[in-house]
Amino acid sequence: MKLNKLPLEVVGNRQQFITLDAHTEGEPLRIIISGYPEILGETILEMKEYVAQHLDRYRTLLMHEPRGHADMYGALITRPVSKEADFGVLFLHNEGYSSMCGHGILALVKVMCETNTILLGCEPRVIKIDAPAGLITATASLDEEGRVQASFENVDSWAEAINCSVMVEGLGEVNYDIGFGGAYYAYIDADALGLSCGRENVAQLIDLGRRIKHAVMDSHPLVHPLESDLSFLYGTIFISKEVTEKAAHSRHVCIFADGEVDRSPTGTGVAARAALLYAKGEIGLNQPLVIESIVDGKMTVSALREQDFHGKKAIIPQVSGRSYITGQHQFIVDPDDQFQDGFILR
């Protein structure tokens, strides 16, 4: 006996979702193709608010177990809201919604091109994407072997605070910087704390990342120059000079949302890190840096140009990394299933 090919025809009137899954440097992305009702809102931030207020059940259904897991990440494609954009996107995770996602942008560009949703020719193709953090300019091209290569210019990124400190339970005084790269992150020197940024230490990094995040949130209020919806600390990024590849500048381990661990170096995180290094005079313009992740994934970031952003001395970072399609899914919701809305069990 053989099952039919996807999509399966299921008996009964059951809600269904079609997704295309991918990863960027090890970090998953579940791209939601169909299943959501109409999303209302005139701006991408209004759409984000509408989804959070009225459709959040679908986030937990697709991100949490048994269909997902505690570290799943999602992208919900929307209609464009700006004249320049090709499409819009909302980003989902275990706790809620993010303002921007670099690994998600890279995976979306790769998927759009490899499925011929966006056609590529001999010349690089510029793709504009509406995200809650702003309009993202991505570029797709084909290498000599015909493989899709993706990069993006991030939103204005800047050093928000340098050389700060906070008391953290179990650690004492911890020094940190804060950078914005589409979201705010607190950067911690793991080497100074004697912390390993290897995968064998992930449980401790999650625990300390959560504690540091909440300590910084309580002591260092953040105010975005334009959007109050972006005025929050998204995560903690541990940085280390202990790398596996000589060409790498450093390693990032990002703990974000509700203890979620980024398998990639974090696209918005490397963008904000470049802004911090630029502000400290440690890098110049057009100086590419390779940054590793906890699973040895790599992203390259550089500061393309400097510009003012409502009083902030900002840079426009360029970020690149490798993405791969991993599968297509047809998720079915049985109305009798007590776990139909999902659950988290670490």
From Swiss-Prot:
Molecular-function GO term, any one: trans-L-3-hydroxyproline dehydratase activity
Family: Belongs to the proline racemase family.
Binding site for substrate: G102, H103, D262, G267, T268
Species for this entry: Shewanella woodyi (strain ATCC 51908 / MS32)
Function: Catalyzes the dehydration of trans-3-hydroxy-L-proline (t3LHyp) to Delta(1)-pyrroline-2-carboxylate (Pyr2C) in vitro. Displays no proline racemase activity.
Reactions performed catalytically: trans-3-hydroxy-L-proline = 1-pyrroline-2-carboxylate + H2O
Domain of life: Bacteria
Pfam families the UniProt entry points to: Pro_racemase
Active site: C101
This enzyme's EC code(s): 4.2.1.77
Protein name as catalogued: Trans-3-hydroxy-L-proline dehydratase
The keyword Lyase appears for this protein: yes
InterPro entries in the cross-refs: Pro_racemase_fam
UniProt KW Lyase keyword: yes
Keywords: Lyase
